């Protein structure tokens, strides 16, 4: 199973986990890291590395961050290893739900593709969708 680590500003990572588990049930191999404005960033980087080790069963780990270019994303990118530890910025609930359903069977490349597609698919302006635009 592909491991997941949510790395976000404030408590958003934990709230995403709660929302995901509300929809699809408890998740194994999932960890959260919250980055605060006064945190020691090297300590948080070590926390990310420890979380990656904890959730990694050999199929890889996806680090999901809230915003590309933000501190959580930059810290996640600093531990990235292409093909083994990947970073997806701009996490949303549809993306997490998709990953929960595919990470047990898909390889890393396919899971990343499906997560990105699902995340994009569910970003909509409701009035445009409802009017058929």
Regions flagged by a language model, labelled:
Residues 2-133:
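N-terminal loops that bind phosphate or other acidic moieties
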């Amino acid at each position: 199973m592909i491991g997941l680590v949510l790395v976000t500003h404030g408590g958003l990572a934990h709230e995403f986990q709660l929302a995901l588990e509300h929809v699809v049930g408890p998740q194994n191999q999932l960890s959260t890291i919250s980055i605060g404005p006064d945190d020691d960033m090297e300590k948080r980087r070590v926390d990310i590395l420890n979380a990656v080790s904890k959730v990694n069963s050999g199929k890889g780990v996806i680090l999901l961050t809230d915003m590309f270019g933000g501190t959580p994303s930059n810290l996640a990118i600093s531990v990235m290893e292409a093909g083994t530890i990947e970073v997806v910025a701009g996490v949303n609930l549809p993306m997490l739900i998709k990953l929960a359903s595919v990470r047990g069977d898909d390889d890393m490349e396919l899971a990343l593709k499906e997560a990105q597609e699902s995340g994009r698919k569910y970003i909509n302006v409701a009035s445009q969708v409802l009017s058929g635009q």
